[in-house]
Each structure stands twice: as structure tokens, then as C-alpha cells.
A protein has these predicted regions:
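Flexible, low-complexity segments enriched in proline/glycine/serine and punctuated by aromatic residues
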Residues: 22-150
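Aliphatic-rich helix starts adjacent to a transmembrane/signal segment
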Residues: 1-37
Length: 150
């Protein structure tokens, strides 16, 4: 009897440890998503006149752009380069991650950024308020609103 109780206790500890590891991973993914969204928001603020060029839907792959780190670029080229950098960042930091950038439906001149990452449990979900796209299935999402011209 004592051995059965001990076995259940060990199984309970293992389950709690596994849950803690899953939560830790989700918090890490959420922190990375917040950083990516913040980086894109700053890029959009610095290039506010081209804010329409930052619009993006789920699964959209950014076209190639000139390397603006060593070459002077126009604002349009800079926006395309920012999108390309976003794609590279997602691939390296949030594998299977995706992003959407949308105009906020009930607030002129405001934009929204949604960063999604693979999560079978869908720990963090976003609603479709203000024109935000649905978070894809089996993914968690982080949403950020910004006004680029401020």
C-alpha cells in the first residue's frame, strides 16, 4: 500500500513538473512575441508616412527588399526591408510564428499588430475587437495597438 501511495506521489510530482515546464515555455514565447511586436511598432513609428505598407495578413511572405543597413533607402524600401526583417526575426525566434498588421476599425490612424506562435493549448488568445484578425487555430497570440504618427 505504501508503495502505491509513493508511486502516485511521484507521478503527481512529475505531472506538476511537466506543467511548470509548459508554462515556462509559454511565458518565454509570449516574451519573445512582445519583443517582436515592440520592435515592429518602433519601426512603424519611425516610418509613419508609409504605415499602409506595413499591412500584412496571416501567411503573407514579404517580398525581397534592398539591404537598408548599408545602403540609403527610400521610405518605401525601408518599409519593405522592415517587413523582411520581421520575417527573419519570426523564423529565428518564433519557429512557425506568424504576424498580421491591420488598421484598427474604430480608431482612425491606429494600427494593430498580432504576433502568433505555435501552441496546441492556445494559452493566449485574442478576440476580433477593432478589426483584429482571428488568432489561428493551435496558436497563441499577442496583440499590440499603436498610433504611428505620434
Amino acid at each position: 500500500v505504501a508503495l502505491v501511495v509513493l508511486a502516485f506521489g511521484v507521478l503527481g510530482l512529475l505531472w506538476m513538473h511537466q506543467q511548470a515546464l509548459l508554462q515556462q515555455r509559454q511565458q518565454l514565447m509570449r516574451s519573445v512575441a512582445i519583443g517582436i511586436a515592440d520592435d515592429l511598432a518602433e519601426r512603424m513609428r519611425l516610418n509613419a508616412p508609409q504605415r499602409a505598407m506595413y499591412a500584412k495578413t496571416w501567411g503573407h511572405v514579404s517580398p525581397s527588399a534592398p539591404d537598408c543597413t548599408h545602403t540609403a533607402c527610400t521610405r518605401q524600401e525601408l518599409a519593405a526591408w522592415d517587413q523582411q526583417q520581421l520575417q527573419l526575426t519570426l523564423q529565428s525566434q518564433l519557429p512557425e510564428g506568424d504576424t498580421a498588421v491591420f488598421a484598427v476599425s474604430d480608431a482612425p490612424n491606429w494600427l494593430g499588430i498580432v504576433i502568433a506562435w505555435r501552441d496546441a493549448n492556445e494559452t493566449y488568445r485574442t478576440d476580433t475587437a477593432s478589426g483584429s484578425p482571428n488568432c489561428p487555430t493551435q496558436m497563441s497570440c499577442w496583440r499590440l495597438f499603436l498610433r504611428p504618427d505620434r
